[in-house]
Amino acid sequence: MLQISEQKYGDIYVITLQNDDLILKTTNFGCNIISLYTKDKNNIFGDIVLGFDSIDDYKNQDKYIGAIVGRCANRISNATFSLNDKEYKLAKNNGPNHLHGGINGFDKKIFKYKILDNGVEFFYLSKSGEEGYPGNLKLKVSYILNENSI
């Protein structure tokens, strides 16, 4: 049976999804996966995710550990791209380049969320012009906990 709990840390929530085989902790800040506990061969739970000890560490990191990134994952050279014969200038956060969505990419956003029967869905609206990107983008991230998988 799935158990779901929420803990509040200011404007950030940690959501825990737990069943007999897995414990997933995630947050509405960057949709970070904080931890994933699974059983070893001796039936003992252990965390298999690289992460931090506190929410503040996630807020202050610059390595994207556990977070989703975007609008673009990877580096955009010279922080510019062309679309339909128009050049767009993006936020520079990696020397002259744009990396993983920029200075305030998805990894730094606080998402709205909805608890589901079997998991959690996160929602965010990236508005046109955010970090230099054109057009609105509706984002949905779902973490669904099945018997022994997410």
Identify the role of each PLM range.
Residues 1-150:
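Surface-exposed acidic/polar loop and edge beta-strand patches at domain peripheries
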